[in-house]
């Protein structure tokens, strides 16, 4: 799953929790959740789960059920936007994101997810505006993810200064933010600053799930440093764990760049 979408899904599920700031506008003043809101929240969580599994038909059904219970439930509209984004129905996706923001313009999830859509559709400058809007909420539970996505989108435009700034802000909030560390390591590698790249890689928590991309970057960093034993060890891990990956194929072909 693409990093931007994965982050968006994590935010949606977290945002549907009754204590999350993203759903505050839907809760009664007493803080209690009505039966309709409870049903909408549960169906939205199910929709997000099915979306993550790639079961788009059921995700659409669950989101529709959520909106039957609570027609103006912004988290459900955000999930609908993400589903239609995956289905490449961009017009419907954008309509759902925009409707969510009309209902709840300060909703951090809605801003973040619309930013995700815009960035994936190569509308990076627009997307960054929405990631920054998500960060205006002082109660936002996962601001590091919006800083990371803003950095990824800035990097896609070639604005490495802004990307560096956004990744550093993510790391200030969460020093072990794995995607920010990976991006900073990759940027350092591209500058041929292998020592700096390795320092970022070593900051990743040991329990972070390794990906083919992480192993491939670490391998090339060790190669740049001339550490042949470490390079060979990482190559073995890459071939064993991800034998069919693009990175493993590049390794076998000796294509390091």
What are these regions, as identified by a protein language model?
Residues 39, 73, 107, 141-143, ...:
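Residue-level recognition of tetratricopeptide repeat
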Residues 76, 110, 144-146, 180, ...:
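TPR alpha-solenoid repeat register
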């Amino acid at each position: 799953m693409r990093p931007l979408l994965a982050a968006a899904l994590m935010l949606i599920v977290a945002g549907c929790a009754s204590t999350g700031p993203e759903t505050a506008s839907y809760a009664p003043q007493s803080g209690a959740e009505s039966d309709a809101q409870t049903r909408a929240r549960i169906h939205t969580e199910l929709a997000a789960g099915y979306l993550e599994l790639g079961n788009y038909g059921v995700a659409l059904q669950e989101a529709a059920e959520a909106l039957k219970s609570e027609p103006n439930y912004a988290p459900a509209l955000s999930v609908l936007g993400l589903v239609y984004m995956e289905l490449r129905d961009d017009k419907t996706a954008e309509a759902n994101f925009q409707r969510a923001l009309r209902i709840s313009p300060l909703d951090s999830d809605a801003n973040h997810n619309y930013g995700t859509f815009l960035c994936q559709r190569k509308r990076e400058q627009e997307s960054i505006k929405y990631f920054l809007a998500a960060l205006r909420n002082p109660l936002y539970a996962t601001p590091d993810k919006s800083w990371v996505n803003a950095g990824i989108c800035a990097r896609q435009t070639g604005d490495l200064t802004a990307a560096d700034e956004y990744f550093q802000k993510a790391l200030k909030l969460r020093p072990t933010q794995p995607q920010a560390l990976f991006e900073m390591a990759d940027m350092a590698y591209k500058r041929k600053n292998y020592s700096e790249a390795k320092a970022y890689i070593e900051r990743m928590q040991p329990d972070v799930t390794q990906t083919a991309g992480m192993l491939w970057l670490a391998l090339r960093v060790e190669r740049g440093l001339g550490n042949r034993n470490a390079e060979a060890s990482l190559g073995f891990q890459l071939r064993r764990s991800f034998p069919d990956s693009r990175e493993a194929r590049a390794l076998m072909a000796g294509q390091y760049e």
